């Protein structure tokens, strides 16, 4: 006769043992995974040039320039089953266009964004609707001063960065 304290293959672990295992795993916290490619390179102790990160959408590895742009745009790495993915320049532009076309909500002119949000322009997070770069204060003030548009897309504000405005 089998000992009642052992787990049978059919029944799995006992409720008491399962609770103990859950307790042990929940008390062990994994360190946070890096959010930027530079942080990933530092964690792996390799030069940024040696970081090969695939694009989540097309699967191509990002070039060194795209790696630098990814971090400059303040985008975050995507982790799936402890595998890391980023987004290449072409897929960033395609994703930005898709989001704008599918999830557009509203448009405001220049400084009206402050009235709508109740925040200072310096406290509003804005990304480029073309390349997804995080806009700096000068770029946001330029949009306000020229009375250009801010667009609300998928609950976040979009404008145009200094580089993309020259290609429109």
From Swiss-Prot:
Localisation: Host cytoplasm; Host nucleus
> Which biological process terms from the Gene Ontology are attached to this UniProt entry?
DNA-templated transcription; regulation of DNA-templated transcription; symbiont-mediated perturbation of host apoptosis; symbiont-mediated perturbation of host ubiquitin-like protein modification; symbiont-mediated suppression of host innate immune response; symbiont-mediated suppression of host type I interferon-mediated signaling pathway
In this chain, the stretch annotated as Disordered covers 1-31
Q: Which InterPro entries match?
A: E6 (IPR001334), E6_sf (IPR038575)
Entry GO terms, CC: host cell cytoplasm; host cell nucleus
- Check the record and name the Pfam families matching this protein: E6
Q: GO terms for molecular function, please?
A: DNA binding; zinc ion binding
Give the transmembrane ranges: none
Task: List the unnamed ZnF regions, as residue ranges.
Answer: 55-91, 128-164
List UniProt keywords, sorted A-Z: Activator, DNA-binding, Early protein, Host cytoplasm, Host nucleus, Host-virus interaction, Inhibition of host innate immune response by virus, Metal-binding, Modulation of host cell apoptosis by virus, Transcription, Transcription regulation, Viral immunoevasion, Zinc, Zinc-finger
Q: Which domain of life is it from?
A: Viruses
The similarity annotation says: Belongs to the papillomaviridae E6 protein family.
- Protein role: Plays a major role in the induction and maintenance of cellular transformation. E6 associates with host UBE3A/E6-AP ubiquitin-protein ligase and modulates its activity. Protects host keratinocytes from apoptosis by mediating the degradation of host BAK1. May also inhibit host immune response.
Q: Subunit details for this protein?
A: Forms homodimers. Interacts with ubiquitin-protein ligase UBE3A/E6-AP; this interaction stimulates UBE3A ubiquitin activity. Interacts with host BAK1.
Its name, as the record gives it, is: Protein E6
Organism from which the protein derives: Human papillomavirus 21
Name of the gene this protein is made from: E6
């Amino acid at each position: 006769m089998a000992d009642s304290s052992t787990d049978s293959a059919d029944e799995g672990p006992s409720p008491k043992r399962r609770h103990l295992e859950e307790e042990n795993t929940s008390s062990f916290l994994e360190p946070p995974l890096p959010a930027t490619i530079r942080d990933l390179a530092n964690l792996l102790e390799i030069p940024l040039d040696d970081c090969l990160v695939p694009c989540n959408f097309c699967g191509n590895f990002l070039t060194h320039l795209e790696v630098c742009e990814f971090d400059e745009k303040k985008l975050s790495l995507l982790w799936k089953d402890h595998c890391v993915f980023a987004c290449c320049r072409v897929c960033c532009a395609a994703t930005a266009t898709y989001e704008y076309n599918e999830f557009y909500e509203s448009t405001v002119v220049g400084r009206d964004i402050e009235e709508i949000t109740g925040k200072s322009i310096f406290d509003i997070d804005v990304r480029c609707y073309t390349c997804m770069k995080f806009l700096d204060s000068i770029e946001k003030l330029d949009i306000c001063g020229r009375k250009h548009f801010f667009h609300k897309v998928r609950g976040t504000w979009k404008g145009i960065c200094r580089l993309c405005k020259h290609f429109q």
